[in-house]
């Protein structure tokens, strides 16, 4: 667990001895699959770091449709905005698989920052990366067609969750077809058509809730 926590954005650049001392103050928590960790609009004063499993972060549109912002896995942190902004949660966090995590509340984090000012710098870097990713996603929605967005999401999931399998890359995403569509920002039918086309070209192979990427180079060219 310590190795996973050391990779979390909040701890990067912090001395290992300090990390070991700080992590002892974290509260472990386990969630079943399909559990809502927190919902959009709820008050919040706690952040979470994933030890194992996957969590989807999403928002609900005025017409009731859900849009997924990102998929998070081991060493990823979520819910940190509520630590600095006392307003309601801006998104919902729901487990895709069984999840083991650790959490801390606002008072604990402020105490950490007072003792270790470098933690605040790491948090700013995490938030800056999130903002950059959001800007990139908005640009993709405007300038990139659906197949291009599907290709890009597959590569991003591969970078985060992929494992080598022979000469291919297996991506166990644990998502339904509808969730993949929500992540891409398109209809399920359009996303399925793009996936079927990629499979027909021999770039990928679809296997339940995983994808075997056999030609990442062509997929990357399609994502541009």
Curated annotation (Swiss-Prot):
Q: What does this protein do?
A: Global transcriptional regulator that complexes with cAMP and binds to specific DNA promoter sites, causing DNA-bending, to regulate transcription. cAMP improves binding to specific DNA sequences, probably by altering protein conformation. The CRP regulon is predicted to contain about 115 genes. Some genes are activated by CRP (rpfA, whiB1) while others are repressed (fadD10). There are 2 CRP-binding sites in the promoter of whiB1, at low concentrations of CRP with or without cAMP transcription of whiB1 is enhanced via site CRP1, then repressed as site CRP2 is filled.
Give one GO biological process term: regulation of DNA-templated transcription
Gene Ontology cellular-component terms for this entry are: cytosol; peptidoglycan-based cell wall; plasma membrane
Location of the DNA-binding region in this protein: 177-196
- Protein name, as recorded: CRP-like cAMP-activated global transcriptional regulator
A Pfam family matched by this chain, by name? cNMP_binding
Q: Where does 3',5'-cyclic AMP 1 bind?
A: 64-70, 79-82, 89-90, 134-135
**Where on this chain does 3',5'-cyclic AMP 2 bind?**
142-143, 178-188
- Record-linked CDD domains: CAP_ED
Q: Which UniProt keywords apply?
A: Activator, cAMP, cAMP-binding, DNA-binding, Nucleotide-binding, Repressor, Transcription, Transcription regulation, Virulence
Entry's Gene Ontology molecular function annotations: cAMP binding; DNA binding; DNA-binding transcription factor activity
Q: How does it assemble?
A: Homodimer; in the absence of cAMP the DNA-binding domains are asymmetric in one structure; upon cAMP binding the dimer becomes symmetric, preparing it to bind DNA.
Inactivation phenotype: Grows more slowly in aerobic liquid culture and on plates, severely impaired growth in unactivated mouse bone marrow-derived macrophages and in infected mice.
Signal peptide positions are: none
Q: Where's the HTH crp-type domain?
A: 144-217
